[in-house]
Amino acid sequence: MIILITNDDGFESEGIKLLKEVARNFASEIWIVAPDTDRSGAARSLDHPVKQSIRINQHNEREFSVSGTPADCVIIALNKIMDKKPDLVLSGVNIGSNVGDDVCYSGTIGAVMEGAARSIPSIALSQAYHGGINWYNTKIFAPKVIAKLVKVGWPKNIAMSINFSATEKVKGVEFAEQGEYNIDGDLTFTENPDGSLSLNWSREHLGSGSVGKIKEGFITITPIKLDFTDYDTLNAMKNSYAEEFSSIVN
C-alpha cells in the first residue's frame, strides 16, 4: 500500500512523526508532503492560486516540505512529486481534536477533503488534549482503527475523521456526527505591547456527537461529505418557492 501523509501542524511536528510510525504497520511506501510551517486553521484553502511561486524542499527520497497549505500539499504531491497515485491519504496527527465547528476551520480536515475529491480514501487523525499533549491513545489504537476502516471501506468523495480522546482509559470506538460547540463561547482579546491583539477563544461543548463522546473517553469516527448541500432544505424550497422565484426573470 502506498500512503501519502500530510498535516497542518507542519513538517517538523510530533504528530506527523507519530503518523509515519503508524503507517509503517501497513505501508509498502510512505510519502510525506507537509507544510513547512504551522498552517493550523487553513481549512481547504489554497496558496497556489494567489502566490507567484511555492517552494518545495526535499528532505530525503520521499519526504518534502512545501510553502503552502495542507490542501496545496496534497495537490502538489499528487501532480508533481509522486510518481504513482497513493492508495491512502493520512492527515495528522493533529494537536487537538477536530470536532464540532473545528471541522470547518481545520487544515487537517482540508487535506483529506482534497484527497477525497480525487476519489482517494483519506483519513484525518486528531488527538484531543488537556494541558500537555499525550499521544498514547493514538499510538496504541490508530493502527487498529485505520486497518479496520481500510478493510470495510467507505464511499468515494467521503473523508473519514478519527478523534482520539485524552482520557486515561478508552471506553471504545463509536461512529458519531461532528457535534456542536457554543460558537460564541468566551471570547477575549488582549492587547500586546506592539499594539497587536491576542485572541483567546474558549468554547463550551454542548455534548452532542463527537464533541461529547471524546470527553466521555471514546474514540470517534465521523464521515465527512464534500457536498455541503442541504438536500432536505433544497427540495423543500424547490417545492414551495420555485415558481415564486422564477417570476423574477419573467
UniProtKB/Swiss-Prot annotation:
Note on how the cofactor is bound: Binds 1 divalent metal cation per subunit.
Catalytic reaction(s) noted: a ribonucleoside 5'-phosphate + H2O = a ribonucleoside + phosphate
Keywords: Cytoplasm, Hydrolase, Metal-binding, Nucleotide-binding
UniProt superkingdom: Bacteria
Localization (cell): Cytoplasm
Cofactors required: a divalent metal cation
Cellular-component GO terms for this entry: cytoplasm
PANTHER family referenced in this protein's UniProt entry, alphabetically: 5'-NUCLEOTIDASE SURE (PTHR30457), 5'_3'-NUCLEOTIDASE SURE (PTHR30457:SF12)
Summary of the function given for this chain in its UniProt record: Nucleotidase that shows phosphatase activity on nucleoside 5'-monophosphates.
Protein name: 5'-nucleotidase SurE
Organism annotation: Wolbachia sp. subsp. Brugia malayi (strain TRS)
Gene that this sequence comes from: surE
